């Protein structure tokens, strides 16, 4: 209600009607186009991102609140990227977000992309669309293509031993390939697919191929004396199978087939000389002793 105040000036009665001055309240408003935010002075935000009650919002050139994906550029391009604003509230989203069935990680610098370390765990996000990727991801490396594997459920990068689709792999920054030493054990991984291989594996040596054997169960490289499929072999400390005539650490001589690598017993002819690899002495060449061989 208006309040009347009376003053007597020079014998004339003057009545002043005092009306309270109204002040516009800062608040949200909506019309058939969208939402905007008015300030106390009647103006409103336009073409800028602002903090309102601890939450970030973005307004277009008309002053309407933006929702969904928005590409922002800050500091003359030093910081730029994709940001996401809630389709209902308009507030900028941060952290892990599930959007249209895909996972994203949103930081103050926008949606992460490529290989990322988040709270000590490694993930990979599409370099264009920024959605989290799972499964096998390749990257160029120093000696060819390197492969990483990201868990189909959590998206976390695999490390250490992992069984994937029934095959074993070992990850150390990426899936290992070729001949590898893990701890005090030797293993071999496919040079292309990176899966662990077992059985006989060869590599070029001097003067010819070198052969190694990896246990079918554990995948570990074997060393020392081994019986494989009923035949006897011997491997050095590095896992390489002996071939030809060898003098071993026990001071005895043995003969291993140069092709099959198996220990040969019985009569052996080398450079025109005949030797007897005694099967009763582990295949060692007989020396300085009398034997009855074939009844003779």
What are these regions (language model features)?
Residues 2-296:
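Extracellular adhesion/carbohydrate-binding repeat motifs centered on closely spaced tryptophans
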């Amino acid at each position: 209600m208006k309040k009347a105040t009376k003053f007597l000036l020079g014998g004339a009665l003057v009545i002043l009607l005092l009306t309270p001055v109204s002040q516009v309240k800062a608040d949200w408003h909506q019309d058939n186009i969208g939402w905007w935010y008015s300030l106390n002075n009647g103006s409103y935000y336009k073409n800028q991102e602002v903090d309102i009650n601890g939450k970030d919002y973005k307004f277009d050139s008309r002053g309407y609140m933006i929702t969904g994906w928005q590409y922002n550029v800050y500091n003359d391009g030093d910081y730029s990227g994709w940001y996401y604003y809630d389709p209902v509230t308009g507030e900028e989203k941060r952290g892990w977000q599930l959007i249209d069935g895909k996972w994203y990680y949103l930081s103050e610098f926008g949606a992460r992309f490529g290989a990322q370390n988040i709270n000590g765990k490694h993930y990979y996000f599409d370099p264009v669309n920024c959605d989290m990727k799972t499964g096998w991801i390749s990257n160029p490396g120093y000696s060819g293509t390197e492969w990483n594997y990201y868990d189909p459920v959590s998206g976390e990068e695999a490390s250490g031993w992992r069984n994937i689709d029934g095959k074993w792999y070992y990850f150390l920054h990426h899936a290992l390939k070729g001949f590898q030493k893990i701890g005090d054990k030797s293993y071999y991984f496919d040079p292309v697919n990176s899966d662990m291989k077992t059985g006989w594996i060869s590599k070029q040596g001097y003067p010819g191929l070198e052969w190694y054997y990896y246990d079918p169960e554990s995948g570990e490289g074997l060393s020392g004396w081994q019986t494989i499929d009923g035949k006897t072999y011997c491997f050095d400390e590095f896992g390489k199978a002996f071939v030809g005539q060898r003098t071993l650490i026990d001071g005895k001589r043995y003969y291993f087939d140069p092709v099959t690598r198996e220990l040969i017993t019985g009569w052996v002819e080398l450079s025109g000389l005949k030797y007897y690899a005694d099967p009763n002495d582990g295949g060692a060449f007989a020396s300085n002793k009398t034997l009855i061989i074939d009844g003779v």
